[in-house]
Amino acid sequence: MDLANIDLQAAADEGVEVKLQHPATGEYLLDEEGEHLAITVLGKDSTTWQNAAKRVNTRNANRYKDRKIPPAAIEAALYEILAESTVKWSKNIEFDGAALKCTKENAAMLYEKRNWIAEQLMEAAADRASYFLK
């Protein structure tokens, strides 16, 4: 078997579309027209994810040299990596009654305020089968 054919980075760089599910019921979230609310995120093996992770890990290591990194800083770093790895989302994504444009800043805000979304995206980004076997 030629291991060169198993290129997780290339697959992760394409990303995976995650159809959002209600955090309590597991039902898919749909808009008024029956369309899924979906976010496309790069996999954790992607170049973007890896570069963002290195950057925030280095920053935290420098900031908290001989101290334990606080959980809030770890969580913020995760949201930053995830926001940077968010490629697009469906046009039916809204927050506080207004359409939300897919930007790094909006993604970070959304993931911080609704961490259940971040959890679903993290799960998909970490599941190599979700982007390699699609």
Residue ranges and their predicted role:
Residues 7, 24-26, 45-47:
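Residues that cap or initiate secondary-structure elements
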Residues 12-27:
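Short acidic, Pro/Gly- and aromatic-enriched capping/linker segments at domain boundaries
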